[in-house]
Amino acid sequence: MHQFSAYKHQAATSTSMQPSKRRYFVTMKLPFDEMLDASGKARPHYQIFHNWLKQQSDTLMGLKRAEADLIFRRVGITFAVYGDDLGSERTIPFDQVPRIFTAKEWEQLEAGLRQRVKALNRFIYDVYHDEEIIKAGIIPGEQIYNNAQYRPEMRNVNVPRDIYAQIAGIDIVRAGEGEFYVLEDNLRVPSGVSYMVEDRKMMMRLFPDLFQKYRVAPVEHYPDLLLECLKSVKPDDVKKPNVVVLTPGMYNSAYFEHSYLAQQMGVELVEGKDLFVKNEQVFMRTTQGPERVDVIYRRVDDDFLDPLAFRSDSTLGVAGLLSAHRAGNVTLANAIGTGVADDKSIYPYVPDMIEFYLGEKPILNNVPTFQCRKPDDLAYTLANLDKLVVKLTHGAGGYGMLVGPASTKAEIEEFRVHLLANPDKYIAQPTLALSTCPTFVESGVAPRHIDLRPFVLSGKTIKMVPGGLTRVALKEGSLVVNSSQGGGTKDTWVLEE
């Protein structure tokens, strides 16, 4: 039998913080464990799995993990790691212990996600049109106009249904019972959804008996929902939209996902060289002549989309694409300029957006955030670097950040120099006690910190599959779940009532 009996909560140092002006007070607690309560007993919705897991041997679980890795590698479910001396292609480590939500928990999350994404789309429309939120003094104009993701080329450009972020990946963490926080909004080219679907397929292949014990909400219909969403935001004059997936190419870290989604939706996977613009319309080169393209699910960043409008050295985009987009002849999902809403410098204002545009209180809370561009916040951050997580406002993938409690004095002092040189580029947040989930590691089953990325589709209506991609920090004590930093993934179960 495996060393499941050793599974227990990891201790965490209790700390508190009280900044000036905002008077936030966040107390570090023992991490909330998804499976076990404070007494060490399995939570009701985990009891069946808990009993099943105790009966599995280390040998069997190790063999199952090796089988999953072999299948993922054969199928090509890998991602690229740039600058990695060990090789450019890796499988994302898959953990066989699922993360389980009750139907009630998911109901709360789904309501909060719908609310948040709706407000974010309203915000993007507003900043490129009437600027009411700036006029109301809720967000300073310079926070938007000086944002590297703000695209003045999109001023007064209308998009179908006024939806700019058709696909959103919202990163959520849990700090306690029913205590969910949004850690980050991903509105440009959110990735990871293919791993959500493939993780479910793998769990059903490895442990089919578990799905006889639980009624788990399905996720495999995500590509169908995505295609339905993309077709619903077609240009107004189009009857039967032609949808394509635009990829930077096979060397992109998420190329598997691009090809997977195109194949599952039954649409063409194209690169920039496969498309051209004529008379402000986009066409695809085919063996039977040019074919008009109406909706592009683009997995290429703004800067590389159009060499005539953005980076002139880009070979990944399509010359003239911006003009076709502005003319309303092609829909880009997501629209150019959506990044203005997911930049970390804008993140602190999302609760205000929800109240301003929807007249509602946020269902999902933000993590308290200090904006280092503000003198008081900077002073507090500098005095508490050993307790905080400090991030670049334009950063991604777990790079360019400091996790104070996990850093050495030398690392903290080195980071202090960067922060003082460019305080406007940083935000800081308390080090939350992210929830843990049992994870199969070399020593047996042990708690590891996790987050959740649900995928929200906004078209004619807002839809999502139950759950999302659970990411896990495989290193003991680590809070960094990104695959580029050694993180893995888990299947996410939402139980049906």
Tell where the protein language model's regions lie, with residue ranges.
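Preference for protein termini
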Residues: 2-497
